């Protein structure tokens, strides 16, 4: 599914990744661990086509996506990937519903209402009205809204960058249960984390 070879990825002051190769198969749960500043999040951004400023080659589902134009990059990003980050990136000035609809084309938003309710139920938010202001949610609830948003378009690959870092144990378990459920239904997960307690035997570990 993914074959990525990074010859060099530069930051203004240093090389952050060099001579790195990775292959990821469909329906793998891959965990990327390592010290802070080692380039884990940068790698995730490269995989997710957020960052294309590196020297190397990237094959996604048999297609070379190295150096693709911006329009094609956006299309593949939306077609393949869902994202969840340590910061939920939820707009607190909007309702839960509006946050979720923000990733859906305007002309398709009406047909997604039932899908949204289903995703909220999957993420344990069915007891909260979709019209609730995001500002009223706890940190764990915001992260579950972010995860529901990431899963809304049925991504083939879910990228999770420290998704439980700022959460209490109960919410960590809830987030991991959702990721594991997505994986059990055929999804591919690539997760960056410092928390080794989240790792199970069926996950593949890549140390940076």
Where are these regions (language model features)?
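Catalytic Walker B motif of ABC-type/P-loop ATPase nucleotide-binding domains
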Residues: 158-161
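ABC-family nucleotide-binding domains
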Residues: 168
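Q-loop/switch helix immediately C-terminal to the Walker
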Residues: 87, 94-106
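ABC ATPase NBD coupling module
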Residues: 65-82
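Conserved ABC ATPase "signature" region
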Residues: 64, 111-129
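Conserved catalytic motifs of ABC-family nucleotide-binding domains
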Residues: 154
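Conserved ABC ATPase signature
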Residues: 133-137, 141
């Amino acid at each position: 599914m993914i074959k990525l070879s990074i010859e060099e990825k530069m930051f203004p002051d240093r090389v952050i990744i060099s001579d790195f190769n990775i292959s990821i198969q469909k329906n793998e749960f891959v965990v990327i661990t390592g010290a802070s500043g080692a380039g884990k999040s940068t790698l995730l951004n490269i995989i997710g086509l957020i960052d294309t400023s590196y020297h190397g080659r990237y094959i996604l589902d048999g297609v070379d996506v190295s150096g693709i134009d911006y329009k094609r990059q956006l299309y593949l990003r939306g077609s393949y990937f869902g994202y969840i980050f340590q910061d939920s990136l939820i707009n607190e000035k909007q309702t839960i519903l509006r946050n979720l609809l923000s990733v859906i084309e305007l002309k398709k938003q009406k047909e997604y209402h039932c899908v949204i309710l289903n995703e909220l139920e999957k993420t344990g938010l069915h007891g909260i009205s979709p019209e609730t202001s995001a500002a009223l949610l706890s940190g764990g609830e915001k992260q579950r809204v972010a995860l529901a948003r990431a899963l809304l378009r049925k991504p083939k690959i879910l990228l999770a960058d420290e998704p439980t870092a700022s959460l209490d144990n109960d919410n960590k378990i809830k987030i991991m249960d959702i990721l594991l459920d997505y994986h059990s239904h055929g999804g591919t997960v690539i997760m960056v984390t410092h928390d080794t307690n989240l790792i199970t035997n069926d996950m593949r570990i890549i140390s940076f």
